């Protein structure tokens, strides 16, 4: 039975209802600082923690609950005679409920504050109390999440107590929270790219209907700190997002963020099927659609500019899962909303692409994101690309890095006319891209040509210029073919494998 509760919260959502309920059941309430003031001003009978400890707050509030008279009351095991004898001798009363939420370090670490100001939001007393209460969960109910208040109130109403299953779950939530909280602090202080221990701080954003396939359960977690496009987007219309939707949206958004020009990316199964740049939003959508008017069906379309009404009217002519853009004209949004299932996503954050992580069985691979497009760019053939061809070549390299290896992209006039990817050898990828393109002008490859066959195949289709990393022991074979066929070729010095 709960006779004594300690309440100290930063987030005061729902705390008055909880406190008044406890008061109605003759529970003695102890509180601190701002929480004490808030409860008292709202008519709750509350005891200042200083009356319990006999010691005032000190060090600008850094020390207020760190006291044996508090922690002894939390940690004492009620059916341990020695424990109860000791706290009675020391004048310590048991504390049966601890209601605490922490200083918002997750939020403050991203604000425009000095280092020392951010450090002040590292909570010490709160974590100490909730860890103690969680350890002694059989005797102490610990609440750290405002969403749990109602359930606990209902259990007490029905059973006059909180059952052991609920107590254990609430205790588990404490250590789950503290793992994330400590991880955020650790990463803030260490500032290491590859620390000895990899600690990640993510919070569940939403439960998903299922994962990649219907038989796979899934949920979506987002970083507790920082601003990221796949964390801070806003859904303006449509059904709930799925696991595959979020994965696809991430790649589509990263692709359009590569370009300063107006850009559009159509994507299906995590692979671009149409990418284009141009002068207007209508132009780039039309070009992206024309890249592959079959595969775009049921896919995702992303833009790096605001979507207008005319483009929206074209978008709803086909079945799409998602349209994502930095913003939408009001009349464009009204058009898109006529498709009630179409997910319309407003995403203002630019792609950060800091680290890539891949889970393997028993480990996590961590690497820098592929942010370097070119390095030692040089023309290696007798013929040089024209300025227009060079622009298309650079465009092609920005696209090919988002296509699964082996990857080839064929480009014409700022549009990816043919995309070949996910092949186990490069010539198959080249044939796929060239066949889809039909009449492309330039070709981009994510990695070097191991033989001269890709250059030979490119010549058959009238390709005028090629861009690739170079570095093969048989580079001269490809260079020779290009010189014989009148093709210019550029080496970049940077490979873009994607697996």
UniProtKB/Swiss-Prot annotation:
CDD domains xref list: IMPCH
MF (Gene Ontology): IMP cyclohydrolase activity; phosphoribosylaminoimidazolecarboxamide formyltransferase activity
Short name of one Pfam family: MGS
GO-annotated cellular components: cytosol
Highest taxon, organism lineage: Bacteria
Pathway noted in the entry: Purine metabolism; IMP biosynthesis via de novo pathway; 5-formamido-1-(5-phospho-D-ribosyl)imidazole-4-carboxamide from 5-amino-1-(5-phospho-D-ribosyl)imidazole-4-carboxamide (10-formyl THF route): step 1/1; Purine metabolism; IMP biosynthesis via de novo pathway; IMP from 5-formamido-1-(5-phospho-D-ribosyl)imidazole-4-carboxamide: step 1/1
MGS-like domain location: 1-144
Keywords, alphabetical: Hydrolase, Multifunctional enzyme, Purine biosynthesis, Transferase
Database matches in InterPro entries: AICAR_Tfase_dup_dom_sf (IPR024051), Cytidine_deaminase-like (IPR016193), MGS-like_dom (IPR011607), MGS-like_dom_sf (IPR036914), PurH-like (IPR002695)
Any one GO biological process: 'de novo' IMP biosynthetic process
Recorded catalytic activity of this chain's protein: (6R)-10-formyltetrahydrofolate + 5-amino-1-(5-phospho-beta-D-ribosyl)imidazole-4-carboxamide = 5-formamido-1-(5-phospho-D-ribosyl)imidazole-4-carboxamide + (6S)-5,6,7,8-tetrahydrofolate; IMP + H2O = 5-formamido-1-(5-phospho-D-ribosyl)imidazole-4-carboxamide
EC number per UniProt: 2.1.2.3, 3.5.4.10
Keyword presence, Hydrolase: yes
Annotated family: Belongs to the PurH family.
PANTHER family: BIFUNCTIONAL PURINE BIOSYNTHESIS PROTEIN ATIC (PTHR11692:SF0), BIFUNCTIONAL PURINE BIOSYNTHESIS PROTEIN PURH (PTHR11692)
Annotated domain remarks: The IMP cyclohydrolase activity resides in the N-terminal region.
Protein name: Bifunctional purine biosynthesis protein PurH
Native source species: Clostridium botulinum (strain Loch Maree / Type A3)
